[in-house]
Amino acid sequence: MITMSRRAESRQIEANEVLDIRGEVCPFTFIETKLKLEEMKSGEILRVIIDHEPAVRDVPRSVEQEGHEVLSVEKVGEKEWSILIKKK
């Protein structure tokens, strides 16, 4: 579970890349995220913006299985979430 302080910290983390995949559904949310991470360098941070509720659970779990670090998952709108991922 992400605490309020961690949520506040996530707003201060500057992402190297932003992937806006609102409108996409699973499994495409993970596929797009994985492809974007493959383009990035180790240690860089990706902010993924999604609006497909099942992806809020599935994308973080899948990228962690790939070895990346999920820094935060935060609801940023009525039906939008921001996921911060640090590439392994």
Curated annotation (Swiss-Prot):
Active-site residues, record numbering mapped to chain: 26 (cysteine persulfide intermediate)
Family of this protein: Belongs to the sulfur carrier protein TusA family.
Pfam families, per database record: TusA (PF01206)
Protein origin, superkingdom: Archaea
SUPFAM superfamilies, alphabetized: SirA-like
Protein known as: Putative sulfur carrier protein AF_0554
Leader sequence residues: none
Residue intervals passing through the bilayer: none
InterPro entries: TusA-like, TusA-like_sf
